Structures are given as C-alpha cells and as structure tokens.
C-alpha cells in the first residue's frame, strides 16, 4: 500500500518562524519519518509492451554469476568520452553500455550538431518539432555508439525564477513540459537510443544541490525540497508521468533531498511513486555522485550508480548473505537494466558502445561522422521557433531593405575559441556572472553543453544578407556607449542572459546589458533588441523606451543561431514562438519564488526549501495574486493576426463520470483510465492578416477550488492569410482532475469547470462552462 506524504496541506510542520541558531540541528535523525518508508522495492513485471524484453532479460540474468551481477550495478572508467559506462560481459555477448550528455546534443566529441536547448523547444510549443528534433538527435547518438542520452530534462520545472538549470527543461508548466518530453522521448527512442529523463524529482535549485563543507569543516547537506503530496502530483510528477507513459526507459534521481530524504534513496519516491503508482519498468540511475547510502539505497529502489560506487560492490553479496537485502532485489536491478537494453533492440545492430566518443579529440582516433544532410531543415526550424517576438512597434519588423544596419552588443559574434564543450563546473555556490561576454549564447553551461558542427553567429548571417541586398553594416561589440551613425536605418542590439549548471543566477537582468541598450536607444530611433536568454530575462529598464521598437527573446537556438534570426528579421519566416514562462514587470513580482532557498538558523547544516506555495508557481501565482505581468505565459507576436470564434464543448459519453477512475492493472504511466478522453473542445481561428502564419491556440481549464486557470491543451496550426482552421482539444480524466491525498487517487470535481481558449494565459477571448 502506498503511503501519503500528507492528507491535507503541507507535509512538514517545520518551525519556520523560529529558526534560531542556538537550536542548530546536527543529526538527520531529527527528520526521520518525514518521507514515509515504502518497502519492498517492486520487481519489474514486463507490463505493457515490455513483456518480450523482460523475458530476454530474465534469461540473461539467470546466466550471471554473483560477481557479474554486481559489476552491472555501477559504472566503471573507460577509454572513451562516455559520461558513464557499464562494463561488458564478454562471455554472454553483452558489449556494455555507453551513457553520455546530454539533452541538447552530444557534448565533448566531434562531427555532431549543436541543437536548440530545452527552453527553445518549450518556446516552440510544437509537438511535431519536438519529436523530429529528438529523432535526429537520436540518430547522432546511435552513430556514435551512445546507448543512453542523459536527458531530456523536466526537473527543474522552473519553480525558482533564478534557477540555473531552468534552460535545460521546457517550461514552467507541467502540461507543456509533459507533452514535449513525451514527444522527445518517442523521437529519441525511435532510433533505439535510451532516454534518461531527469532529475527525479523537485530538483528546483542549484544552490546547495550537493553536500558542502563550511569554514569550520561542518558538513552542510543537500537542500531538501519539502513538498506535499498534492503539489508533487499536480506539478512536479506530472511530466515524469508523461515520460513514463511515452516509454521512457530510464529515470535519473536527483542530488537534492525530498522531504529530508535523499532522492536516490527515497523509498517513497522510487518504490512507491515511480515503480508502483506509475508502473515504471525501466531502471533508476543516480545523477553523477548522488549516492549517499549503500544497501539502503538499493532497498529503496535505486538500480544503478554512476559514475561508480564505493559502497555497493561486494557489500551487496554480504547484504544478501546476512539478510539485509533480498537476492531478488539484486536480480531485479539487473533485470531492469537489461530489459531496457532488449526493449530498444540494442542487442541487434547497435554500434559498439562509445565507438565515436574518443577520450580526447586531440588524440589519434577514427572519425565517426554523425551529422546528416537530412537533419538540416529540423536544426534550422528548431532554431527559428526558438524565437519569441514580444514587441513590434509600428511594423519595425520585418526589415524593409535597410541601407545601413548598425550592430551592437557582446552577443553578436561567435566565441573566439571552441573546444567541443568540455569546460564546465559542478560547483553549487552563486558566484557566476549573469551574462556571457565571450560571444553569442547558443547554449547554456554545464553538462547540458553541446558540440556544434559550426556556429553561425548573428553578425555572420547579417553580413551575408547585407551582401545580397547591397546594404552597409557597421558594428561595435565592445563599447558600452558606442557611437551610432545618424543615418542608421536600424540598430540591432545583441545581449544575453547566461545560466549554467552548478549555480543559480544572481539576477534576472544586468546593469551592463541594460546600459548598452539604453545608450544605443538614446541615439537610434529604430532600436531592435535581441536577447539570447537561458531563462527569464526582465526588461524593465528599457521595455517602454520609445526608440526600442522591437524585442525578441531568442532563447538558445543552437548552431543555426544567426541563420534563423535573419530569416525572421527579413520576413522569410514568420515568428511563431511563444513564451514558456511569465516575464514580470519587476523581479520582485516573483516574490518568494525569485531566489533559491539558503541555509539558515537551526537548519544551517540541513538546508530547507519549503514548497509552501503549493501549485502556485509562474502564471498560476501571478493569477492568484492579481499581478499583471510584462509578458504573459504563452505570449508571442506574429507578422499576422488571428481571430478566435465558435467555441464548442462536448462530453464524450452520456451520464456523469465517476469521481475516481475505474480500477485497472497498472501500466507504464499509471492507471490507464487516467488517460480516457472525457471531453472534446473545438474552436475556429481565422488569419486576419496579410501573410501566412502559425498560431498557437491554447486551452486553459479552471478546475473548481483550483488555480484560476491551468494549461490543458494547445495546438499549433499553420493558417494561410484570409483562411480559417478548426483546432481540436481532447481533455482526459487526468486533465480535469486534482490529486486526492486521502484516497491516493486522481479525483474529478463535482461542480462547474471553466474552459478558456485563446492566445496566451491572459488573452483568452473564448470562454464556456462545463458541469460534472
């Protein structure tokens, strides 16, 4: 039986008002029981379409010696650049497993592409593009002999506005993240490459993500994300559930603690939620160095340790002998690992693990070319749809044959050196700059870096277009207050907002970049600002400046960063990106969710991050508190306009559906009745402008006693000028339910639901009601 974290409200009654230093907690025994124990670890069953893989895996495991079983539970060093490596069992024809970073393309190797980042996929709001991007990335991983990609990312979700890794995920919304991770998993695994969906779970800040030692040599443990059962299910678990439903073969447990139990040894999460409630058939791997217990972590549901384990090894055999661990648990750990290998047919026609991943690109090695001409259109389209136009005064864009283009800002040119993305830092203190002055920001920092085949910088693409048009180009990339030619037809200003693994950002804007924009706008009546942003970037200093005629949030488009932008600037492509987060007028509008939690008072050795806001993050919080954003979640402009009409809602069956879903055998993703389609919604959209364009129709639901509105559907449609299209949304039982912590079930609400359809979370011209 599953145990709830709390029947009502917040799970941990921490003494938030009295965190006095004189009562400093020095032992984790203080927190025992806050994450309820769930044992034993359930064995994989082969449910769903896993039956054949489990039959093969069990036959394989039956042939292993105890020593061979143990060697498959942890990584080893290899002569490759694989981030992690499971050693081979030669006598059984098992070649081993290569795992490698990351979710935006391969890092640290040659002959691969640098794809748009997760935040850019989120900005695209495009299911099909997410799938295609995943498939072409998967081809590259496969050619390089990478069995498992360490991604995609849906944790962090984006709770903390300054979160250092928000850019690796898709959106500050569980529904949008869930749809996009589902399509990404399907695309990647269509190429027989395993996915490691990460970081499970509530990994919402980089500050104190790992244990540290203070100046007095006291150990400060990883931050604890203290979260109630309802919030866990309705926000943070939601996209992981979608990933499991899509067939994800691996989940990576995170560095943080959850309700004061380390995520990689949290039996409630691994045994209870993931392997029982969601019916997960794959295996759980640690984030690198995230194992903090030995046999206890195995019993809690951890299957594989990376990059190696100092606590398992022969201790597993000893534990089985003395009864502290069942032999069946060890067998299940290996069965889950091997079932994944068989599930993706990696036992047939898969390249040798790590064959295209030389340990050092500067050493002699065979060139394994993973790029392909067929990927080019998807690379470019992914970059194009990364861009969100949020301001366009008096038709400043598209550009109209400018005679003189002046280009400014440190973000316009390609980095002066490029080393295949090998430089990153896993620290966890806040000391990094929030801008990247070494060139255009095509990707964020850390293990999510990629290794582009080239970088087509904005200035390079602008010069190519200027050559074709006979335009002149002036530039100054270094001056904070540059001279501006009076006859400039347009001034393009390039700035960025940097973020990296290991650090949370210090601010949502920076004075240097703001000064550059203001100084140029003061001397140029047609100033267009392009921001390459690894997360939210506020613009209160210049957003309303009369001479700032257009603003583009370009996010992290990957290697086609310049080519994509120029197509948009000149109207060869239309803007169709939409914001996957809320941009506030002032940073203070994010309230307690602006900054990460810090060690303090009695919890200085056991940092606490209390998710007391519940489900109210990003636009839900702005709606709840009545705060008007600068740019709403889902907002974005186009070169055309759209008109909405004719909203229709129909129930898919007569009668009133039951409050709880019917009982059923658990399949990967959970109770299959959660995904029964209960309601169909349609609306008509007409392109009222003069050019063709893609509109992102968004459906929000107001569930009784819940947030004002929650995203529960979207459809991106291409509509020709003057034409109309009908968009259709299907609402499942889960879409219309809330989590009942008492019953441990998803529950439909009796009463009146509100259904909204429109352009973004604040511009919803169509509204109807639905009664259950």
Swiss-Prot record:
Biological process, per Gene Ontology: cellulose catabolic process; glucan catabolic process
Signal sequence, renumbered to the chain: 1-20
UniProt-annotated glycosylation sites, renumbered to this chain: 259, 315, 322, 438, 523, 547, 574, 586
Entry's transmembrane regions: none
Reaction(s) this enzyme catalyzes, per UniProt: Hydrolysis of terminal, non-reducing beta-D-glucosyl residues with release of beta-D-glucose
Class in the EC hierarchy, top level: hydrolase
Keywords, in A-Z order: Carbohydrate metabolism, Cellulose degradation, Glycoprotein, Glycosidase, Hydrolase, Polysaccharide degradation, Secreted, Signal
A Gene Ontology cellular-component term: extracellular region
Protein EC: 3.2.1.21
UniProt GO molecular function: beta-glucosidase activity
Pathways involved: Glycan metabolism; cellulose degradation
Chief location bin: secreted
Subcellular location(s) of the protein: Secreted
Active site residues according to the UniProt entry: 287
Superkingdom of this protein's organism: Eukaryota
Protein task: Beta-glucosidases are one of a number of cellulolytic enzymes involved in the degradation of cellulosic biomass. Catalyzes the last step releasing glucose from the inhibitory cellobiose.
Similarity section: Belongs to the glycosyl hydrolase 3 family.
Name of this chain's protein: Probable beta-glucosidase M
Native organism: Emericella nidulans (strain FGSC A4 / ATCC 38163 / CBS 112.46 / NRRL 194 / M139) (Aspergillus nidulans)
């Amino acid at each position: 039986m599953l145990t709830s974290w709390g029947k009502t409200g917040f799970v941990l009654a921490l003494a938030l008002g009295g965190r006095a230093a004189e009562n400093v907690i020095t032992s984790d025994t203080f927190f025992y029981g806050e994450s309820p124990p769930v044992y034993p670890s359930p064995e994989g069953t082969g449910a769903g379409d896993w039956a054949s893989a489990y039959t093969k895996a069990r036959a394989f495991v039956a042939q292993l010696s105890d020593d061979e079983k143990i060697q498959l539970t942890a990584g080893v060093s290899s002569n490759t650049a694989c981030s992690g490596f499971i050693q081979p069992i030669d006598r059984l024809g098992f070649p081993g497993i290569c795992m490698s970073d990351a979710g935006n393309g391969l890092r640290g190797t040659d002959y691969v592409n640098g794809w748009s980042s997760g935040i850019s996929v989120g900005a695209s709001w495009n299911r099909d593009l997410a799938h295609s991007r995943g498939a072409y990335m998967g081809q590259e991983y496969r050619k390089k002999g990478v069995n498992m990609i360490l991604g995609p990312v849906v944790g962090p979700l984006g709770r903390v506005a300054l979160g250092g890794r928000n850019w690796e995920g898709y959106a500050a919304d569980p529904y949008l993240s869930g749809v996009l991770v589902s399509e990404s998993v399907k695309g990647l695994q269509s190429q027989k490459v395993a996915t490691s969906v990460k970081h499970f779970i509530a990994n919402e800040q980089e500050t104190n993500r790992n244990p540290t030692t203070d100046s007095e040599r006291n150990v400060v443990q990883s931050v604890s994300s203290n979260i109630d059962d309802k919030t866990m299910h309705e926000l943070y678990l939601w996209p992981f559930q979608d990933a499991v439903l899509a067939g994800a073969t691996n989940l990576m447990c995170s560095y943080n603690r959850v309700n004061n139990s380390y995520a990689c040894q949290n039996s409630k999460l691994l045994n209870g939620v993931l392997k029982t409630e969601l019916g997960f058939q794959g295996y759980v791997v640690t984030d690198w160095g995230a194992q903090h217990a030995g046999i206890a972590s195995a019993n809690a549901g951890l299957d594989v340790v990376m990059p190696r384990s100092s606590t398992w090894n022969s201790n597993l055999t000893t534990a089985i002998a003395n009864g502290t661990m069942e032999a069946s648990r060890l067998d299940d750990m290996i069965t889950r690992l091997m079932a994944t290998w068989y599930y993706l047919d990696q036992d047939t026609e898969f390249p040798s693990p790590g064959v295209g991943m030389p340990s050092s690109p500067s050493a002699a090695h065979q060139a394994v070319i993973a790029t392909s001409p067929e990927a080019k259109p998807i690379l470019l389209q992914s970059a194009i749809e990364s861009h969100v136009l949020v301001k366009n005064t008096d038709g400043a864009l598209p550009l109209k044959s400018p005679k003189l283009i002046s280009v400014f800002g440190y973000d316009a040119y390609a980095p002066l050196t490029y080393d295949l993305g090998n430089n990153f830092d896993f620290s966890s203190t806040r000391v990094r700059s929030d801008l990247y002055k070494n060139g255009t920001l095509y990707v964020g920092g850390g293990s999510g870096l990629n290794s582009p085949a080239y970088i087509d910088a904005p200035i390079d693409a602008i010069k190519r277009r200027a050559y074709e048009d006979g335009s002149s180009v002036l530039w100054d990339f270094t001056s904070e207050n540059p001279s501006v030619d009076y006859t400039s037809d347009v001034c393009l200003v390039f700035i960025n907002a940097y973020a990296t693994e290991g650090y949370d950002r210090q601010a949502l804007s920076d004075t240097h970049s703001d000064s550059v924009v203001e100084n140029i706008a003061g001397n140029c009546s047609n100033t267009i600002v392009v921001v390459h942003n690894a997360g939210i970037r506020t613009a209160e200093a210049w957003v309303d400046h009369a001479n700032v005629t257009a603003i583009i949030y370009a996010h992290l488009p990957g290697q086609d960063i310049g080519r994509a932008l120029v197509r948009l600037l000149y109207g060869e492509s239309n803007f169709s990106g939409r914001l996957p987060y809320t941009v506030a007028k002032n940073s203070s509008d994010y309230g307690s969710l602006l900054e990460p939690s810090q060690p303090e008072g009695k919890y200085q050795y056991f940092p606490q991050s209390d998710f007391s806001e519940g489900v109210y993050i990003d636009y839900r919080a702005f709606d709840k508190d009545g705060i008007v954003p600068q740019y709403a979640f889902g907002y974005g402009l186009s070169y055309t306009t759209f008109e909405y009409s004719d909203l229709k809602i129909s129930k898919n069956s007569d009668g009133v559906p039951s409050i709880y879903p019917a009982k059923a055998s658990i399949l990967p993703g959970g109770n299959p009745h959660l995904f029964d389609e209960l309601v169909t919604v349609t609306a008509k959209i007409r392109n009222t402008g003069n050019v063709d364009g893609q509109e992102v129709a968004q459906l929000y639901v107001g569930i009784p006693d819940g947030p004002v509105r929650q995203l529960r559907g979207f459809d991106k449609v291409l509509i020709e000028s003057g034409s109309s299209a009908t968009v259709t949304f299907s609402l499942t039982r889960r879409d219309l339910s809330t989590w009942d912590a008492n019953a441990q079930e998803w529950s439909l609400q009796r009463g009146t639901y509100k259904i909204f359809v429109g352009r973004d979370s604040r511009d919803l011209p169509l509204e109807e009601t639905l009664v259950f």
